[in-house]
Amino acid sequence: MQLNSTEISELIKQRIAQFDVVSEAHNEGTIVSVSDGIIRVHGLADVMQGEMIALPGNRYAIALNLERDSVGAVVMGPYADLAEGMKVKCTGRILEVPVGRGLLGRVVNTLGEPIDGKGPVEHDGFSAVEAIAPGVIERQSVDQPVQTGYKSVDAMIPIGRGQRELVIGDRQTGKTALAVDAIINQRDSGIKCIYVAVGQKASTIANVVRKLEEHGALANTIVVVASASESAALQYLAPYAGCAMGEYFRDRGEDALIIYDDLSKQAVAYRQISLLLRRPPGREAFPGDVFYLHSRLLERAARVNAEYVETFTKGEVKGKTGSLTALPIIETQAGDVSAFVPTNVISITDGQIFLESNLFNAGIRPAVNPGISVSRVGGAAQTKIMKKLSGGIRTALAQYRELAAFSQFASDLDDATRKQLSHGQKVTELLKQKQYAPMSVATQSLVLFAAERGYLEDVELAKVGGFEAALMAYVDREHADLMQQINQTGAYNDEIEGKLKGILDTFKATQSW
């Protein structure tokens, strides 16, 4: 078969017309150095701050230093096989994590990947880990309570929905225990919980997850893990990832509670990254923007108004406010709250719960020091009954501390002073509480009523715990309806006062403890 020149030229023209080049523009660069999880890349002209850079082997790095002739990026994951000369690409994307209800009851890593062996995570889309906090106009004042289930916290240092309340103290003072109990207490409150574990041992995190499961609270909780064995980059990003997951509920008119355990370890991870990127060190070798590291995270915890929720959901949710409440944890060294990171976070948050090792070792648990613990906005969120009955508790404890310091030097004390000391000791004893045993508003109110109205005067100090346990069992058995009513309304009036008085009078007359 012979082709003439006309046919050949026609065929070539046809092929040229059909030919289509699919070109994909990539901003590509070359790794010029790798050390300690930090890569320097040359040739990335259009990279953004915080952009994900695609590495060989389906891994990513995050661009943190944009310099004149190179980009400093931190690798998320293993980096031992990365070498000079390898090609990397810009993705044009900021780091995002999966969000949605499907994450509840799951344990995930910083990137939202499941690590609990329960299969893939169902999600409702992705959300950027870095987000701008709601503005002043979009917020609403805090006026609804978050009950932790701890008498000492709910009475003296109340927490409201949308508040940031710092939990601060030395190691082994019960900070995580307080946070975990607060999560357990939200089982039936409708508040979704996120627990972010940063730089902790995997065995400790596994224990927390097991306890949440035992007490039926895991189904309502997302656990985000960046354990001590993870890279500094993942430890630094974990709180932001957890916050993005919490904002999903906040922006849809629901309430969420997030625990950052703890931000001291996140600051140390960020310091490590910054020093490896050769950023100039400041106080305690932290970089200059360590305040911004925590402020941009904690400002995202807020109560947003109904207009914000309606606009965000495009009219699907109307008349509902949303909130994200944060309980950041900070670990101090030898009780030094004036160190750099603790003072930063104290100034960012709306109050702090200070846990003291001396109190913890003396058997006063939770080891809350009511003298320097404060809640700046939670008072407006307290239920009416708690507000009414908790007023005298803080005063009684303050007077007791003052007199206790005094009485060490005085040999003979008058009756009024003795009475005040005895009352203070009994209130201190009454505020003790076992772990994993959060109390409802009604039972807390009854106990506070007993302390406030002098029902403990003739109870021996050693029997205060027994008195409380017997009282709890008695009201559960005989007055469950009243307890339910108080839990639902939180109201306090002459009728409820009379009923509480009647319960205690009958209990003291007929029961033993």
Curated annotation (Swiss-Prot):
UniProt keywords, alphabetically: ATP synthesis, ATP-binding, Cell inner membrane, Cell membrane, CF(1), Hydrogen ion transport, Ion transport, Membrane, Nucleotide-binding, Translocase, Transport
Site label Required for activity, positions: S373
Superkingdom: Bacteria
Cellular component terms per the entry's GO annotation: plasma membrane; proton-transporting ATP synthase complex
Molecular function as annotated in GO: ADP binding; ATP binding; proton-transporting ATP synthase activity, rotational mechanism
Annotated compartments: Cell inner membrane
Documented EC number(s): 7.1.2.2
Membrane topology term: Peripheral membrane protein
Pfam families hit by this protein: ATP-synt_ab, ATP-synt_ab_C, ATP-synt_ab_N
Binding site for ATP: G169, D170, R171, Q172, T173, G174, K175, T176
Span of the signal peptide: none
Known catalytic reactions: ATP + H2O + 4 H(+)(in) = ADP + phosphate + 5 H(+)(out)
InterPro entries on file: ATP_synth_asu-like_sf, ATP_synth_asu_C, ATP_synth_asu_C_sf, ATP_synth_F1_a_nt-bd_dom, ATP_synth_F1_asu, ATPase_a/bsu_AS, ATPase_F1/V1/A1_a/bsu_N, ATPase_F1/V1/A1_a/bsu_N_sf
Stated family: Belongs to the ATPase alpha/beta chains family.
Function: Produces ATP from ADP in the presence of a proton gradient across the membrane. The alpha chain is a regulatory subunit.
Subunit structure: F-type ATPases have 2 components, CF(1) - the catalytic core - and CF(0) - the membrane proton channel. CF(1) has five subunits: alpha(3), beta(3), gamma(1), delta(1), epsilon(1). CF(0) has three main subunits: a(1), b(2) and c(9-12). The alpha and beta chains form an alternating ring which encloses part of the gamma chain. CF(1) is attached to CF(0) by a central stalk formed by the gamma and epsilon chains, while a peripheral stalk is formed by the delta and b chains.
Protein name listed in UniProt: ATP synthase subunit alpha
Gene expressing this chain: atpA
